[in-house]
């Protein structure tokens, strides 16, 4: 698990400095056309004061393809994200020029509007961080505040916008248009499978929500075709997450017109559920015909909290409302944040004692007060697409801890460390035998062999997914197929379905198979005299002694029993308890409070890859979500005091959100993303009160705390190539062998992070975990700083360790906006409590890390919960995805003629005389002119003749009207592409010169991607005067395209009308029953 916390400032000096630094980034308020004064939003906090390009500003949009390889510096682990791609014309005002004001007429996201010399009591009431400096900081006044009007009440939620799949004209799309023709089927299939894993989906089986929607509409044999299409759409997204996947592209993943319904559903399901088109990506508005009528207000969605969950939800809603654009409605999303900044428990605090020469010019060094670690980008972490694919933030890959220091300052022997760690893992594994085993319901699976080879199964037996799965669960599948020939030998692999997430093991193997004594010998331990190799641990008495057993009690008992088997020393006890402290850091609480059966209920959902940190501050991520592609409406300093919601969810009553400053907001839907700690402290009144089932989950789950001590030094005195080092702690009785004695102190400065790679300064961050985290809440600053400095001097005796120049101590439990750090599974928690936390109450929805049962206590879990809440809201507004009936047409049946000219142009499945296509049989057909008498109901032997009949009909139509006008191409809508044509030569020359200078090769040439990146930089740095002609040209092109498109649609409509008249006339003169093909000459 990962810490997800953030903090406010405490103390006048800390507040005034924070304001003075952030004021350098601020611009003045702007007034919108409607008269509401609206503050501009800040761009990313690492904005360069000089106005040069920020690292988070992506270069220009490129075609969807494989992302470029990361450039890694193996010596220090620093990695640059792949160059993110975006249309720069829509981004320039977002990043260049410094941090703007945040939203809605309230105070700025990272500043306050009061004079720093004014009374700060109100500001400090909710803050809990101590900041100290060895010098007096300069004071700087900030800009006065501006006012904001209330959000107007909207009319009832509109549902006029149709789903993306509703009434779709599939014939206008091209099958296989998104499948690269140069790739072999197997290679393409492997890319699709990899993409599904990268998006947290099983490439071989349906997600449970997919199955719920499709089970009555989809033939179980067509699951393979659906998965191939869905995985193909995911491939498009993962290849370049800077470009949203369009419906045209998605339907191009179908290999045949017959699968267009599947592709349409897959696309809309992936969009709605946040598997594609999420994050800082531009979503083009849906192309819908203008409507006549009065404009009306769309739904107003108020999101409470501007952390990762709140910003992620708001950003996703903005994108979904664009995707489901209705010209007559204007939905609004407003985010209310109680702090003066955004980011929630992600807070990168500016350091002011030193300036860094290692960071880019103008970038302020920052220390992470809360969330700090990205726990692997691979296997589905959505932060991969945002951090590396969209914002292109540099990050530092972390190395595992290699050195732990003992209480005397000496490094612990690696062999002893390894033996004690294995012993700790053994105790933890044996405690896992009491884990609650979740029941995982399998879902329908496709044919793995066909999916891996990129092939579809086209046959149908008429059984839906529900029918087949129910029979499979009942063991009656064989009764469905009395004649094996019906299935033509094709097996459907569902009996051994693998779940979307790896199943929780029923036991942990070695702990049950091997006696404890024998396991210890295998670790390198020598048993005490008289202990037989068959001796083992008996944890049952402790595990079953209480109705609510805890992990801590059982693990403590395991250590005690090992003391009777092994010659453990006080040093071994310190080492084992260091690992206990590390587990307490992961859970933000003493392990004595964790549920024995459910503490690791997220097991199996871990992401893969090395852990990393964002260089320059993690807070760039929420700032990027907030500001790109367009700024969200965020109102800071809006402390919510009461939420009067509609518990029925009928839509007849509005929700009113009341703030402490007297302002109120009327909304159709509310998303509550404040922490579980806020809910536990009853800081906000709910009217009506939350139901018992919701309050029960709030009470049963735990909300812990983890604190940090941040130390800034003049020079580093530690090994700067190591990312972290550990420190063993001793109990009050130094040589105690009593396990319980170690609990209070084991997490006190147990781990130090070396943050030079991310801050550019000599910075150490000491962690306070378990009981020590609570001790930090009330221990004076001076005592904490003196102790941690003394410990460092004890370790590094060979150098004179100075006093730190700057110190910051976090106190998350005292922060009124969080009341802690992150959630954990407490002893009395029930298996479904995280799901209950996520469940909406009427029109009140919930998001945040404590509502994400698969990834709790993490930044990515908070973000995923925001995507889930956005999906719930869009479904409540629009209803479920529309599924056509039939979802998959019968094999050989073509698309209706009148839907598009494309059908006539294909002429693969020609329509019959009644205007609808006749099924084409795959059986043999006669080819001679003396075919037996036929009727429209006999389709078995006349395929070739029907094709000849249709060809003759279309030849007559084309002879009279000519072929239909081809669909016009839309061109010239990206000003950057026009700019690129003019400046490509200049950029290439500059890149070649740079390449030749760095490689010292006079013939070196820059790669095409390097030239594109340089062009993106040139475009972003270009003046408005240079850009104006290209932007104006795109507007001209847009108008021209509209005129051409309208003319083409009119011409096509007229051609279709005339072709239908000719067709009827020709068919009347040449009835199919008597028509014979002309004799061959």
Curated annotation (Swiss-Prot):
PROSITE patterns: HMG_BOX_2, SWIRM
Record Pfam families: Amino_oxidase, NAD_binding_8, SWIRM
GO biological process: epigenetic regulation of gene expression
Changes seen on gene knockout: Does not affect whole genome H3K4 methylation.
Domain (SWIRM) ranges: 192-287
Low complexity: compositionally biased ranges: 66-81, 141-161
EC number: 1.14.99.-
First-tier enzyme category under EC: oxidoreductase
UniProtKB keywords: DNA-binding, Nucleus, Oxidoreductase
Ranges for region Disordered: 37-173, 902-940
SUPFAM superfamilies linked to this entry: FAD-linked reductases, C-terminal domain, FAD/NAD(P)-binding domain, HMG-box, Homeodomain-like
An example Gene Ontology CC term for this record: nucleus
Similarity section: Belongs to the flavin monoamine oxidase family.
Functional note: H3K4 demethylase-like protein. Might not act as a H3K4 demethylase or is not the major H3K4 demethylase since its deletion does not affect whole genome H3K4 methylation.
Name of the featured protein: Histone demethylase-like protein A
Source organism (scientific name): Aspergillus fumigatus (strain ATCC MYA-4609 / CBS 101355 / FGSC A1100 / Af293)
């Amino acid at each position: 698990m990962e810490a997800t916390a953030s903090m406010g400032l405490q103390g006048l000096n800390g507040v005034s400095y924070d304001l003075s630094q952030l004021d350098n980034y601020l611009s003045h308020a702007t007034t919108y056309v409607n008269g509401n004064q609206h503050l501009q939003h800040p761009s990313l906090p690492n904005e360069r004061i000089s106005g040069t390009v920020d690292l988070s500003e992506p270069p220009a949009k490129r075609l969807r393809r494989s992302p470029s390889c990361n450039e890694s510096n193996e010596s220090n682990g620093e990695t640059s994200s792949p160059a993110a791609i975006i249309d720069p014309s829509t981004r320039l005002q977002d990043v260049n020029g410094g941090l703007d004001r945040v939203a809605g007429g309230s105070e700025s996201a990272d500043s306050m509007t009061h004079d720093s010399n004014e009374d700060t009591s109100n500001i400090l009431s909710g803050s809990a961080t101590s900041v100290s400096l060895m010098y007096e900081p300069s004071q700087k006044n900030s800009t006065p505040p501006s006012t904001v009007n209330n959000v107007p009440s909207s009319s009832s939620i509109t549902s006029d916008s149709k789903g993306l799949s509703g009434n779709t004209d599939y014939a206008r799309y091209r099958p296989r248009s998104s499948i690269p023709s140069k790739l072999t089927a197997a290679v393409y299939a492997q890319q699709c499978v990899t993409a599904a894993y990268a998006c947290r989906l099983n490439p071989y089986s349906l997600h449970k929500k997919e199955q719920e929607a499709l089970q009555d509409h989809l033939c179980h044999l067509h699951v393979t075709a659906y998965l191939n299409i869905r995985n193909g759409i995911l491939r498009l997204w993962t290849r370049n997450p800077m470009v949203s996947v369009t419906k045209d592209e998605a339907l191009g993943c179908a290999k045949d017109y017959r699968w267009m319904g599947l592709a349409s559903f897959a696309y809309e399901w992936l969009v709605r559920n946040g598997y594609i088109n999420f994050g800082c990506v531009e979503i083009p508005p849906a192309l819908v015909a203008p409507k006549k009528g009065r404009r009306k207000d769309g739904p107003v969605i108020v999101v409470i909290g501007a952390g990762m969950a709140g910003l992620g939800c708001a950003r996703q809603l903005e994108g979904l409302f664009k995707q489901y654009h209705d010209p007559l409605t204007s939905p609004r999303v407003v985010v209310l944040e109680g702090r003066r900044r955004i980011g929630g428990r992600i807070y990168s605090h500016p350091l002011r004692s030193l300036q860094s020469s290692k960071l880019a010019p103008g970038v302020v060094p920052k220390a992470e007060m809360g969330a700090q670690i990205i726990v692997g980008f691979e296997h589905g972490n959505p932060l991969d697409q945002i951090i590396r694919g969209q914002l292109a933030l540099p990050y530092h890959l972390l190395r595992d801890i290699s050195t732990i220091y003992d209480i005397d300052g000496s490094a612990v022997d690696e062999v002893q460390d390894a033996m004690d760690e294995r012993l700790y893992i053994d105790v933890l594994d044996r405690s896992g035998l009491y884990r609650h085993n979740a029941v995982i319901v399998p879902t329908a699976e496709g044919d793995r062999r066909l999916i891996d080879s990129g092939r579809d199964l086209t046959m149908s037996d008429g059984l839906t997914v529900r029918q087949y799965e129910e029979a499979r669960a009942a063991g009656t599948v064989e009764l469905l197929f009395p004649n094996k020939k019906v299935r033509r030998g094709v097996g459907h692999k569902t009996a051994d379905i693998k779940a979307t997430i790896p199943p929780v093991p029923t036991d942990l193997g070695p702990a049950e198979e091997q006696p404890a004594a024998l396991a210890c010998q295998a670790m390198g331990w020598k048993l005490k005299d008289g202990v037989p190799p068959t001796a083992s641990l008996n944890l049952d008495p402790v595990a079953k002694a209480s109705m609510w057993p805890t992990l801590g009690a059982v693990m403590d008992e395991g250590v005690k029993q090992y003391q009777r088997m092994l010659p453990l020393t006080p040093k071994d006890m310190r080492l084992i308890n260091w690992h206990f402290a590390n587990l307490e850091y992961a859970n933000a609480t003493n392990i004595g409070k964790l549920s024995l059966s459910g503490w690791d209920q997220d097991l199996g959902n871990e992401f893969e890859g090395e852990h990393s940190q964002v260089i320059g501050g993690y807070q760039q991520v929420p700032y990027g979500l907030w500001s790109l592609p367009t700024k969200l409406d965020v109102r800071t300093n809006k402390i919510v005091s009461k939420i009067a919601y509609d518990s029925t969810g009928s839509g007849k009553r509005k929700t009113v959100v009341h703030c402490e400053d007297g302002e109120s907001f009327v909304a159709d839907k509310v998303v509550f993303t404040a922490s579980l700690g806020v809910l536990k402290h009853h800081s906000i009144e709910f009217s009506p009160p939350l139901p018992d089932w919701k309050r029960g989950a709030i009470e049963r789950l735990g909300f812990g705390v983890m604190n940090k001590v941040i130390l800034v030094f003049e020079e580093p005195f530690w090994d700067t190539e190591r990312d972290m080092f550990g420190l063993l702690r001793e109990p009050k009785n130094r040589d105690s062998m009593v396990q319980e004695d170690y609990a209070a102190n084991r997490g006190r400065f147990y781990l130090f992070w070396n943050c030079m790679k991310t801050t550019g300064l000599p910075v150490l961050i000491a962690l306070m975990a378990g009981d020590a985290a609570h001790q930090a809440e009330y221990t004076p600053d001076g005592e904490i700083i003196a102790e941690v400095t003394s410990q460092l001097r004890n370790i590094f005796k060979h150098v004179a360790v100075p006093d730190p120049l700057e110190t910051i101590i976090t106190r998350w439990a005292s922060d009124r906006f969080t009341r802690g750090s992150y959630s954990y599974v407490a002893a009395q928690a029930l298996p479904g409590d995280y799901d209950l936390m996520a469940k909406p109450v009427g029109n009140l929805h919930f998001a945040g890390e404590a509502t994400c049962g698969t990834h709790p206590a993490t930044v990515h879990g908070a973000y995923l919960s925001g995507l889930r809440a956005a999906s719930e809201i869009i479904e409540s507004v629009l209803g479920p995805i529309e599924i056509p009936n039939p979802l998959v047409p019968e094999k050989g049946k073509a698309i209706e003629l009148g839907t598009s000219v494309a059908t006539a142009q294909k002429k693969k499945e020609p329509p019959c005389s009644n205007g609808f296509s006749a099924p084409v049989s795959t059986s043999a057909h006669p080819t001679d002119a003396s075919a037996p008498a036929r009727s429209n109901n006999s389709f078995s032997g006349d395929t070739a003749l029907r094709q000849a009949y249709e060809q003759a009909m279309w030849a007559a139509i084309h002879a009279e009207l000519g072929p239909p006008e081809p669909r016009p191409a839309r061109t010239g809508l990206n000003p950057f592409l026009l700019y690129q044509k003019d400046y490509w030569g200049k950029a290439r020359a500059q890149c070649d010169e740079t390449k030749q200078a760095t490689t010292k090769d006079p013939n070196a040439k820059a790669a095409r991607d390097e030239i594109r990146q340089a062009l993106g930089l040139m475009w972003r740095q270009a003046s408005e005067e240079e850009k104006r002609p290209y932007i104006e040209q795109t507007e001209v092109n847009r108008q021209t395209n509209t005129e051409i498109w309208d003319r083409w649609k009119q011409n096509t409509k007229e051609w279709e009308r005339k072709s239908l008249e000719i067709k009827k006339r020709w068919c009347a003169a040449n009835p199919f029953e008597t028509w014979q093909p002309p004799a061959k000459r």
